Amino acid sequence: DGPAQKQNTVNQLLVLIYLYK
């Protein structure tokens, strides 16, 4: 569950940056 949660957070960050761009 740890790694999966971390990947989810990274994905969310990428999406945020993509939207912010």
UniProtKB/Swiss-Prot annotation:
Q: In which tissues is it expressed?
A: Hemolymph.
Give the source's domain of life in one word.
Eukaryota
Q: Which GO terms describe its molecular function?
A: oxygen carrier activity
Keyword Secreted included in the entry's annotation: yes
Q: Mind listing the UniProt keywords for this protein, alphabetically?
A: Copper, Oxygen transport, Secreted, Transport
Question: Does the record's keyword annotation contain Secreted?
Answer: yes
Which compartment or compartments is the protein found in?
A: Secreted, Extracellular space
Q: Which GO terms describe its cellular component?
A: extracellular region
Q: Which family does it belong to?
A: Belongs to the tyrosinase family. Hemocyanin subfamily.
Protein purpose: Hemocyanins are copper-containing oxygen carriers occurring freely dissolved in the hemolymph of many mollusks and arthropods.
Its name, as the record gives it, is Hemocyanin subunit 4
- Native species: Maja squinado (Mediterranean spider crab)
